[in-house]
Amino acid sequence: KKVRIGIVGAGRIGNVHAQSITYHIPEAEVVCVTDVYEPAAKKLAETYGIPKYGADFHMIIDDPTIDAVLVCSPTPTHADIAMAAMKAGKDVFCEKPVDLTIEKIKATEQVAKETGRKLQIGFNRRFDHNHGRVQQLAKSGKLGNIEIVKITSRDPEPPSPEYAASSGGLYIDMMIHDFDMAMF
């Protein structure tokens, strides 16, 4: 049986995940996509052959045939959607950051513990082959005693001022990957 996935958020990252699942993960299928801007959800559904789409994420949360939810919506909505999904019995992959406050992050973690649902945060670079190789070399001691780490990241284009303001800015939304790589 394939894992049936709903994607909340049909922007750039939602598109990346829909494409990856559709073309590279035969054990899973995206069966619904939602976005507050319904035309974006419709376009994503049409592009990847996703059978259902809409504007309200509850159509994913309330669907008993959906096993897991990918939260790819704007940062201020991550925690609430993730908690609702887990309370509805669904496993969750949530883009980072979970929230802009420690309190909501801890509340989301607590819901995962209470419900027994899986909660994975989108630290995707942990699974990148090149990062993995560097990590192996560092842990093996072949790189010696590491005292300084210099990381350079590149996105296709800078975020809009509106996005940077609502997502926590460069440190919380983008450099979080660099901090994760340095600590991982």
PLM features per residue range, with description:
Residues 1-48:
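N-terminal Rossmann-like dinucleotide-binding module
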Residues 41, 81, 108, 134, ...:
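Aromatic/hydrophobic pocket-lining residues that form π-stacking "cages" and hydrophobic walls in ligand
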Residues 125-184:
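Predominantly a Rossmann-like dinucleotide-binding segment in NAD(P)-dependent oxidoreductases
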Residues 32, 52, 68, 118, ...:
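Short, Asp-centered acidic motifs that coordinate Mg2+ and/or phosphate
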Residues 17, 48-111:
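Beta-loop-alpha module in the N-terminal Rossmann-like domain of NAD(P)-dependent dehydrogenases
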Residues 107-124, 144-150:
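Rossmann-fold dehydrogenase core element
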Residues 28-32, 67-69, 169:
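Short active-site oxyanion
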